[in-house]
Amino acid sequence: MSDEHYLDNEEKSVVIVMSSGPSTPHRCATPFYISAILASMDAEVSIFLTMEGVKLGQTGVAENLTAMQGGKTIIEFMRDAKSAGVRLYLCKPAMPGYQLSESDIIEEVDEIANAGKMADLILACDKSLFF
């Protein structure tokens, strides 16, 4: 086992690329849960919603979606992550395929961005996760 402890390391950055969406609700809570934990451990965390993941940024979707019956809504997980300092990006090129316009997007999204931004985030981060 390593002698290093997470608090002994310099600041870390993590990018979570999330392509899961409403068709796979059981995959939608964990990325936000993990990101909140990482951010509370002083990591700089970004989540990039792409492909079907952009649907989670649509008003009314995450508010009415749970990963498991009787569980917290996905928007609650998203808000927990935001409260911990996680930045949330939404893929602009994916929006037309899901008939989304900027006026449809929830306030929790920090930035509507292109794939170049996602590539920059991935290349600059210490760790990347894909859901």
Description of each model-found segment:
Residues 1-9:
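Positively charged, low-complexity intrinsically disordered leader regions
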Residues 14-29, 62, 68:
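Short, glycine-rich nucleotide/cofactor-binding loops
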Residues 28-43, 47:
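Histidine-anchored nucleotide/phosphate-binding helix
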Residues 39, 82, 122-123:
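Anion (oxyanion) recognition and catalysis
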Residues 44-50, 88-92:
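Short internal beta-strands
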Residues 53-67:
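N-terminal beta-loop-helix "entrance" segment that forms/cooperates
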Residues 64-92:
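A glycine-rich helix N-cap at a beta->alpha junction
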Residues 108, 112, 116-125:
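C-terminal binding/interaction regions
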